[in-house]
Amino acid sequence: MGRYDNLVHTFRKQYNHWGDFMPPYQAYFRGHDCLPDSSFYSSYRCYMKEAFIDKEPNFHSEEEYLCFTGYDMLDPWGTFDADIEFWIGEKLSKLEKHIINKPTIVRIPPFFWHCPLQYHRVGKPVYLQVLGTRGKFGTYVCRLDGKGGYSIEYTGLSGQKKCVMDPEKKCTVCGKCYRAREKAEDPKNATESALRYRSFDF
């Protein structure tokens, strides 16, 4: 045991079940849950095919960054070959669409709405790194009730939420519950989703 073992974290390969648009594994640094007193959070993912999983606008109480590059670290520019639709705005009524088609980093200020996010075309794998500036990283989501109303739902701290499939375990964002929770009335694309929120001026 070293004196500073508490400052060193070894990544664990976490298997996921999102679908064939991702490799069967992912890596996470869950801030305080990995290194006590950490003020940083990060996930590391590869998208290999078209995908639409971030369907609802959300915000965090801390600043967040989304970094998109080509997956080949020897040439992250030359290997970027994708079209990604991303929405962001200070209010839901002001959500603005951006098309990402080259290596890009997005700064998301605290309490700024962001998403939906959709990978429309993926010619080559895309590397996404999510960076949160807090060791305990939680998400607030706007949920529509289908009757013109809404609720703001706090989905809990990452690393602390219970698994939907097995409440005895913690959620690892493995995606196993993703398909099971899909509904027929869910938006089919990012633009459709974003436009559903345009009437909410907050």
Predicted regions and their residues:
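A short beta-strand-loop-beta hairpin characteristic of the jelly-roll/cupin
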Residues: 68-101, 139-141
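Conserved metal-binding segment of the jelly-roll/cupin
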Residues: 97-119
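Short coil-to-beta strand junction motifs in C2/discoidin
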Residues: 59-62, 81
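A short, N-terminal "cap"/entry segment at the start of jelly-roll beta-barrel domains
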Residues: 1-57, 160-202
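Internal interaction segment
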Residues: 135-163
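Beta-rich globular "head" domains
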Residues: 61-65, 69
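A short hydrophobic beta-strand segment most commonly corresponding to one strand
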Residues: 107, 121-141
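Short acidic (Asp/Glu) patches
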Residues: 50-52, 88-94, 109-113
